[in-house]
Amino acid sequence: MSTREPWAEGEMLVHLSYEATRTLGGMGVVLEHLLSAPEYRQAFPRTLLVSPTVRPCGLGSYAPEESLARDLETHGEVFYSGLRRDNPERWARVFRPVEEQHDVSFVYGRRDAPGGPVEVLLVDLTDVLRGYRVRMGTLPKFLARLHTLLGVDLPFDCRGPRPAAWRGLSRVWRQRFGTRLGAAPWVNRLFRKAVRHGLLDAPALDHDAMLAIVLAEPVFDALERLRPTDGAGTVILAQEHLSLPLAYKALLDGRRWCRTVYYAGEVRTPRVLVEYGEAGQGASDARFYNIQRLGLEQGKTLDQVYPVSTWPNFQILRNGHLCDRVGAVSASVADELRFLDERYALQPVTVVPHGHRPIETGWDAKEAARAKVLAHARNAWGKDFRLLLTHIARDEVCKGLWRDVDVCEHLATLLPPERKPALLMMVTEWNEADPSDNLRALKTRVDAFNAKDTGLHIALVNQPTWPAGLDFTRDDLHRATDVSLGQSLYESYGLAQLEALGCGAICVISGASGARRALKAVCERQGLSEAAHPNLVVSDPVADARAAGLAHSMETWKALPASVLREAELRTAERVAEEVVRRLPRDAHEGRLLLATGWALSERLHWEPLIREQLLPLLRFPKEEAQDVSDWSAAHG
């Protein structure tokens, strides 16, 4: 009996991320818009989204309550699960040989998505990967090939298979509880306790990089069994260092039937340096991007400036130029790639920006949404607010959430009386029992600011889906927004802070945002400079620090004290607050003008032409090109 369904033929696109069953960030948004495009569905009748069932978390352990397998069971259709006892024989023949070879479990099925169903493949490898310790017999040879061919040298502790007793108990555990033993809550609690008491070693690791390498072989072997049998090809779309090792495996062993595209959504090594600096310097976009600018001018590469050559993510990312096609989500990401490794400058890096979803908003709809949102705000925070600021972002250092408080410190004194009381809603997500250091520091500052009762209140909302369950929608929140804040230190593109643009909001964007150059180009086509656009304010500590003459060489930028950079950052916050107040509409007429100018800019950023004219050409391979099998594997294998 065939292992194929009628819908399972034709060209297939494979995407490995953490978002096979749920949209978490910009990458998931891109996928949703791509999947909804008829031109994409015509080019790729099959889409396979791949994820690990659970993601490694602190101390090299797992959080099984986050299992994506439950998502697929609840919101999709499961054809096969190596985590349960009984499966159709035809699917067992496909997956069990790979599971037994690598000691992993697969969950395979499909779910609804924009434009039609997609296939989903989840991989549970919690029995074979724990921190940097790996119990996968095939991995040493794969690591040796990566080292020989790509210079990738990762600090894995490769051990033999799990003892028979563990494997037997894991079998029983997954048949009863639907997870492998390595994902069992009690196992992970014991592991964390052992680490805290010094009984086990769990050094700080780039868990994503470790996971990426271990995923590559079992996922590739499963793809070989799921790939089209009608002569159609397969394209692996890699967007960051989690998915690049799978592309490398395909370059080594899948050239007959597979092509690879590296469409960089972010570059992790620069991001880490922006967020944490070198040797505890602390977060600074001004330091890193001014060093990068000088490095590119002088022909330097990242590992010549920073000690990153042993970082796993750096070793993985620097070889992405080997893929058949290379693209980037923004010109700033393309610059980061060229700084990462000089070989990215030897071939075209196609910039395909993200699109934007304009929210249909007339003046009456805006006023109605505003009434709903402000009524809720009055009930929740006890005041009749006259100005609404919003920021929706994940709890990550790179989002620069403290900069919102910096701006509010100045707005509190600059806002005219008729604009008070004002409210900033910061919508994010955190674990109440164990908030991150970043979130804990933010809450401390917010509490101190609110205690001063300046007429501007900051509300932290711990619910990423907010306002679900209330009498208004997320689109209503954007319609009601007067000022949308987004002052990230690292932002490969930056969609969130632009969502309210078409609703007439003043959008504060980061100078480091990948979207900035795209917006600047659109403004120029409209006959406006970026600085003159009434709906845009650019928060640019990078340029401000350079203009202030804080440093003039890579060495002096690296040595600059954090306190000096912080003082410059605060001056930027003051300038941003002044620009926001200057742009606030004084009456309904000016409000309508802001709505018109915001919509005019927003509608020129649609997804559809970007997908049709730029992204699909990056992903599609003409038949003659697809059949031109490179000798890469023969030359390097």
Predicted regions and their residues:
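Catalytic cores of nucleotide-sugar-dependent glycosyltransferases that transfer UDP/GDP/TDP-activated
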Residues: 1-637
